[in-house]
Regions:
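Structured beta-strand/loop patches that form or line metal/cofactor-binding pockets in enzymes
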Residues: 4-46, 51-58, 346-351
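Conserved, mostly hydrophobic/aromatic
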Residues: 9, 40, 47, 73, ...
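Metal- or metallocofactor-binding catalytic centers and their adjacent structured scaffolds
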Residues: 11, 43-123
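A cross-domain feature marking catalytic cores of carbohydrate-active enzymes
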Residues: 54, 144-146, 176-178, 205-209, ...
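Metal-dependent enolase-superfamily TIM-barrel catalytic cores that perform enediolate-based chemistry
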Residues: 133-250
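Shared catalytic-loop signature of beta/alpha-barrel
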Residues: 221, 227, 238-255, 260-364
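Extended hydrophobic packing segments that form well-structured cores
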Residues: 369-389
Length: 389
């Protein structure tokens, strides 16, 4: 352990990494042609190094949050104590309030915050979940996010085959990407449901806010007998009243929040009774500090928290540590625990980024007890894909 009174942030390095995809794939909002990540590396004068990641949406240039970190946040943090995490969170938030509060600015803050927690864990030789109060669970059930399109409409047969592949890989929870037109969505779900019949698989759907209220309701009604765990982003993030209306009309739990930011944004969702399940992304909601704020707020409103994650291995590791520490919202001996989003779409560098890649253990993810995030970054991989030299 270093000297708690003297440790200082010596440098902050931003790594923008990208890789083109051999086969682009689509979600409802467009075609993903490359995978990107904005990673931050924070170095201290005591030799501790922390890693963080800003959530980079499928269509979002990673350079945006990188510029935020380099130009707006780094000058605030140099020579500060990396252990003053909450103090620094508010310092960053307050300094960017007039041009931030949402989007890539908060993603930049999130990346820095994750790296600071990684440093704190390494400094104290403790995993982050222990610093958050302990682990409610040491193993986490993953769910396969996939079912993206490589042609567009008319892929029901291929998506059904994908469902069987996920099942063979021991996934018993799967999230299906919809939003390609109501008729096509329903055909795809029928095909997936048919091949998984009697296999005890739980499905979720995610339209990535492709529809207005009427179409979103029609889709939910058509799938009401599928026993869906949740219906994600049925309408646009701005249409909070639409969320509330759908939640009151449908018998499917409504989920959302990956495009919301900080406890202030989630307070609006909760006060409007807009969601059954909140889905903050740790790489964009304010980091580990930000998600702590949101979890506590959600508990007071009786809303479940199930973090969203679509980033690289750093974001996955942060999500695992946080999910381990989330209390069940509605306590019972058979209470439903949060599950880990495990993206199954093409990602050239996610596994390669770690010296110890994430592996499933009999269909579950083990929560690392190593210090900090519990990962070791493969710097050669960072340099291989880095494009902001």
């Amino acid at each position: 352990m270093g000297d708690i009174m003297s440790i200082k942030i010596k440098d902050i390095i931003v790594h923008v990494i990208k890789s083109e995809l051999d086969i682009p794939f689509a979600f409802s909002q467009g075609w993903v042609k490359k995978r990107s990540a904005t990673l931050v590396e924070i170095k201290t004068d005591e030799g501790f190094i922390g890693w963080g990641e800003a959530f980079c949406q499928g269509l979002e240039p990673p350079e945006i949050s990188a510029a935020v970190i380099e130009t707006a946040l780094k000058p605030l943090l140099l020579n500060e104590s990396p252990l003053d995490i909450e103090v620094l969170w508010h310092k960053m938030y307050n300094a960017t309030r007039d041009f931030g509060r949402k989007g890539s600015v908060i993603s930049g803050i999130s990346a820095v915050d994750i790296a600071l927690w990684d440093i704190l864990g390494k400094f104290l030789n403790q995993p982050i979940h222990q610093l958050l109060g302990g682990a409610f669970r040491k193993k986490i059930k993953p769910y396969a996010t996939g079912f993206y399109r490589i042609k567009g409409q008319g892929e029901a047969k291929r998506l059904a085959e994908e469902a069987l592949s996920h099942f063979e890989n021991k996934f018993d929870h799967m999230k299906v990407k919809l939003g390609f037109g109501l008729q096509d969505d329903i055909k795809c779900m029928e095909a997936i449901y048919d091949v998984l019949e009697n296999k005890n698989v739980t499905l979720m759907i995610d339209t990535n806010h492709a529809y207005g209220r009427s179409e979103a309701f029609t889709l939910g009604e058509a799938l009401k007998d599928y026993n869906l765990r949740w219906y994600e982003e049925p309408v646009t993030p701005e249409d909070i009243q639409g969320y509330t209306e759908l939640r009151s009309k449908l018998n499917i739990p409504i989920a959302g929040g990956e495009n919301e930011h900080t406890l202030y944004g989630f307070r609006t969702l909760f006060e409007a009774k807009a969601v059954d399940i909140a889905q903050p992304d740790i790489g964009s909601c304010g980091g580990i500090s930000g998600v702590r704020h949101i979890i506590n707020l959600a508990q007071s409103f009786g809303v479940e928290v199930n973090p969203h994650v679509w980033g690289s291995a750093v974001a996955q590791a942060a999500s695992i540590q946080v999910i381990a520490s989330i209390p069940t919202t509605h306590h019972s001996i058979y209470a439903r625990s949060p599950i880990l989003e495990y993206d199954q779409s093409s990602h050239p560098f996610r596994r390669e980024l770690l010296e110890n890649p994430l592996e499933l253990d009999n269909g579950m993810v083990n929560v690392s007890s190593k210090p900090g995030l519990g990962i070791e970054i493969n710097v050669d991989t960072v340099n291989k894909y880095k494009c902001n030299y």
